[in-house]
Curated annotation (Swiss-Prot):
Its main location: plastid. HAMAP family: NDH1_NuoM. It catalyses: a plastoquinone + NADH + (n+1) H(+)(in) = a plastoquinol + NAD(+) + n H(+)(out); a plastoquinone + NADPH + (n+1) H(+)(in) = a plastoquinol + NADP(+) + n H(+)(out). It is an enzyme of class 7 (translocase). The chain crosses the membrane at residues 4-24, 35-55, 87-107, 113-130, 134-154, 167-187, 211-231, 242-262, 272-292, 305-325, 330-350, 364-384, 386-406, 416-436, 463-483. It is found in: Plastid, Chloroplast thylakoid membrane. Pfam families: Proton_antipo_M. This is NAD(P)H-quinone oxidoreductase chain 4, chloroplastic. One of its GO terms (molecular function) is NADH dehydrogenase (ubiquinone) activity. Belongs to the complex I subunit 4 family. It comes from the Eukaryota. Its EC number is 7.1.1.-. The gene is ndhD.
Length: 500
């Protein structure tokens, strides 16, 4: 038991500090912006300090455990803890949120509320990744939806209310299944509700009941990940949201679904997972092909990037379904890798829109000469998205491939077939990615417009882009840093789960 509440401070600090925004003096938006960025940077540094000095990477058990009785009547505890599975997403959350608040610098309308919602979202996401109690997990899952809905409905495009309503209907519908699963596991087999992750992991269920629990949790996480056919909220949401909100959606929100699949479906419901894992491979493979093909037909720039995100999530599903150390490590690496690449692409799409006020690719063209810095950065991240060797996406997708090939669970012919179809998906990725760059940056549509109408990337945008690019390059060159966090925990999940 940890005696100093590091994790509680890390979870509560952003929303508590965010609530103080409303009491700041009325001296313009600059004070609010700097205050929010200071809180994000301080939170990120505090998180990094805590993990550096109080977390042992070679220990697969839960560390920094905190357990406080919260509601006596339900035996509900404020129970936090981290392990190799959660430390990566928590650091990713801090990094992307800090950059998203910097990206939101131009937002001036209701900036107090906007920045408070960003910080409230920060708290909910870190709370979800560090929770060790099923009901606390559900509360953080729900708490995170409210800021996203408000950010969508108040700071978005012309169809923002439609996309916000669609988002909340999909995610709230999925949350019903999550709540049913949480209550089912909590109330099963004892007079006292047992919501502790450790107790639930050691609990055995009748197979039909475990399958029902698995399907309930799977639907909830499939909406958030998203998994086809529950993905249609994502392109509409990304198409209308402000690009700083898109950075949080692509960088962190989608990863919550993947984290839930590993943390609950794989760790707590291992027998059902071994039954459904072949179906995960099939769904993941179809998703890679379908989303890549659909992305190619999108006229809207942000919707094309959104479908590319759906395609890349297919690799995470396949890695989770492979039931191998290699495949699961590859899926966790893809979670981190796509967090940076997806956030960067949406940021660049948003800054481009700020300049040319166009969202349809067939109306663009010839921007490369007018904005060479944005062209260079966008092209670089497009290469990272299509898994260029030396970038993080290449390592993640390659390791997922190896995970499928080395899996002992599947016969040779299905493995060859799935690998072949995945390879087709990887061929489609450069087609839609390079086509997007060609339509935006080449051609003559903007060639004859005087340069005074446009300005290239400024210092703030360059700093943001470089900050997102360095981790992509660093992970691509040295992925062992990420693996060192998760490899022991992955071994424990697979050995405990599938030897029961």
């Amino acid at each position: 038991m940890n005696y100093f509440p590091w994790l509680t401070i890390i979870v509560i600090l952003p929303i508590f500090a965010g609530s103080l925004i409303f009491f700041l003096p009325h001296r313009g938006n600059r004070v609010i912006r700097w205050y929010t960025i200071f809180i994000c940077i301080f939170e990120l540094l505090l998180t990094a300090y805590t993990f550096c000095y109080h977390f042992q990477t070679d220990d697969p058990l839960i560390q920094l455990m905190e357990d406080y009785k919260w509601i006596q009547l339900f035996d509900f505890h404020w129970r936090l803890g981290i392990d190799g599975l959660s430390i990566g997403p928590i650091l990713l959350t801090g990094f992307i949120t800090t950059l998203a608040t910097l990206a939101a610098w131009p937002v001036t309308r209701d900036s107090r509320l906007f920045n408070f919602l960003m910080l409230a979202m920060y708290s909910a996401q870190i709370g979800l990744f560090s929770s060790r109690d099923l009901l606390l997990f559900f509360i953080m899952w729900e708490l995170e939806l409210i800021p996203v809905y408000l950010l969508l409905s108040m700071w978005g495009g012309k169809k923002r209310l439609y996309s916000a309503t669609k988002f909340i209907l999909y995610t709230a519908g999925g949350s019903i299944f999550l709540l049913m699963g949480v209550l089912g596991i909590g109330l099963y087999g004892s007079n006292e509700p047992t919501l502790n992750f450790e107790t639930s992991a050691n609990q055995s269920y009748p197979l039909p009941l475990e399958i029902i629990f698995y399907i309930g949790f799977f639907i909830a996480f499939a909406v958030k990940l998203p998994i086809i056919p529950l993905h249609t909220w994502l392109p509409d949401t990304h198409g209308e949201a402000h690009y700083s909100t898109c950075m949080l959606l692509a960088g962190i929100l989608l990863k919550m679904g993947a984290y839930g699949l590993v943390r609950i479906n794989m760790e707590l419901l291992s027998h059902a997972h071994s039954i459904f894992s072949p179906w995960l491979l099939i769904v993941g493979t179809i998703q890679i092909i379908y989303a890549a093909s659909t992305s190619l037909g999108q006229r809207n720039l942000k919707k094309r990037i959104a479908y590319s995100s759906v395609s890349h999530m297919g690799f995470i599903i396949i890695g989770i379904g492979s039931i191998t150390d290699t495949g699961l490590n590859g899926a966790l690496l893809q979670i981190i890798s796509h967090g940076f690449i997806g956030a960067a692409l949406f940021f660049l799409a948003g800054t481009t829109y700020d300049r040319i006020r166009l969202v349809y690719l067939d109306e663009m063209g010839g921007i490369a000469i007018l904005m060479p810095k944005i062209f260079t950065i966008f092209s670089t991240f497009s290469m990272a998205s299509l898994a260029l060797p030396g970038m993080s996406g290449f390592v993640a997708e390659l390791i997922v491939f190896f995970g499928i090939i080395t899996s002992q669970k599947y016969l040779l012919m299905p493995k060859i077939l799935i690998t072949f179809v995945m390879a087709i998906g990887m061929i489609l990725t450069p087609i839609y990615s390079l086509s997007m760059s060609r339509q935006m940056f080449y051609g003559y549509k903007f060639f004859n417009i005087p340069n005074s109408y446009f300005f290239d990337s400024g210092p703030r945008e360059l700093f943001l882009s470089i900050s997102l690019f360095l981790p992509v390059l660093g992970i691509g060159m040295y992925p062992d840093f990420i693996f060192s966090l998760s490899v022991d925990k992955v071994e424990v999940i697979l050995s405990n789960s599938f030897s029961k």
